[in-house]
Design a protein with these regions (language model features):
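S-adenosyl-L-methionine
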Residues: 2-66
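Conserved class I S-adenosyl-L-methionine
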Residues: 71-80
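Conserved SAM-binding strand-loop segment of SAM-dependent methyltransferases
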Residues: 112-122
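A short SAM/SAH-binding and catalytic strip from SAM-dependent methyltransferases
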Residues: 130-146
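A short glycine-rich, Lys/Arg-flanked "PGG" loop and its adjoining helix->strand segment in the class I
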Residues: 147-159
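Conserved beta-strand signature within the Rossmann-like core of class I S-adenosyl-L-methionine
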Residues: 160-168
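Short alpha-helix
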Residues: 190-208
C-alpha cells in the first residue's frame, strides 16, 4: 500500500466511504444537523453543520483577512459546503475548494464557488503554487495523521505562501477511530485526529513548517504557518 493510499481518510466497510456514503452528505443537503463524530469508546464530538452551511461569520473573517494580498490563489482543503470559498471570492481572492463529499461540492457551486471532488491526498491543480492553503473546521484531523497532512498541505504552497490551520481550542493530542453519526444512523469507521496549538506546532516543525502567527477568535484557535 502506498503512503497516499494509506493516508486516505477512510477505513472502508463494504462499499461505503466516510463523508461520502454516510449522514454527513445528507446533513449538508438539509443544511442542518444534529451530527457527531462517535468514538469507539462511545463518546462523541458535535459537528457544527449549521455553521458550516451558513455564510462566513465570526472567526472566519480572520482567515479571509489573512488571505488578502497573497500573491497566488487560495486552496481550501476539506472545504465542506463552501462558505470560506464563497467568502474569499466575495473579498476578491481567487479560491478553489477540495472535498470528497459530492453534497459539499454541489453546495459550493450553488454559492458561486468551485470545488473539486477529490481527497486532499489526490493529485491537485497547481501543486506548489498556491498562495494560501486552508485547513479549517477540524480538517487537521483528515487521515488521522496530522504530520502527514501538514506535510501535504505545505507542499502545495508556493514559496512565501501561507498555511492557515484551525487547531482544537484546547491542548489535546489524540487519534481515534470514529464514525459520522446522525439521527438516522452512522457511517463506516475511519481514523481521525485532534490537535491543539502546541501539538500542531510540534508536528508542523517536524515537516519543515514554521509558525508565523497564532491567534484565537470567537472560541476558535488558529496557526499561520510558512515553509522554512
Amino acid at each position: 500500500m502506498s503512503p497516499r493510499t494509506a493516508l486516505r481518510p477512510a477505513l472502508r466497510t463494504g462499499t461505503a466511504e466516510p463523508w461520502v456514503d454516510d449522514p454527513f452528505g445528507r446533513a449538508v443537503r438539509a443544511g442542518r444537523g444534529p451530527l457527531w463524530l462517535r468514538r469507539a469508546d462511545g463518546s462523541r464530538l458535535a459537528l457544527e453543520v449549521e455553521r458550516w452551511c451558513a455564510p462566513a461569520a465570526g472567526a472566519d473573517h480572520g482567515l479571509v483577512l489573512r488571505c488578502l494580498g497573497l500573491s497566488a490563489p487560495v486552496l481550501d482543503l476539506g472545504c465542506g459546503p463552501g462558505r470560506l470559498v464563497a467568502a474569499l471570492l466575495a473579498a476578491g481572492v481567487p479560491a478553489l475548494g477540495v472535498d470528497v463529499c459530492a453534497a459539499s461540492v454541489e453546495h459550493t457551486a450553488r454559492l458561486g464557488g468551485l470545488a473539486l471532488r477529490r481527497s486532499v491526498f489526490d493529485r491537485l491543480p497547481a501543486e506548489g503554487r498556491w498562495g494560501g492553503v486552508l485547513l479549517a473546521d477540524g480538517n487537521l484531523g483528515i487521515g488521522g495523521d496530522p504530520g502527514a497532512l501538514l506535510a501535504r498541505a505545505g507542499a502545495l504552497l508556493a514559496p512565501g505562501g501561507l498555511l492557515l490551520v484551525e487547531t482544537a481550542a484546547q491542548e489535546v493530542d489524540e487519534v481515534a477511530d470514529v464514525r459520522v453519526e446522525g439521527p438516522d444512523g452512522a457511517g463506516p469507521p475511519f481514523r481521525w485526529a485532534r490537535c491543539g496549538p502546541a501539538a500542531t506546532l510540534r508536528r508542523a516543525r517536524a515537516v519543515g513548517l514554521e509558525r508565523a502567527e497564532r491567534w484565537d477568535s470567537h472560541g476558535r484557535s488558529f496557526l499561520a504557518l510558512t515553509r522554512s
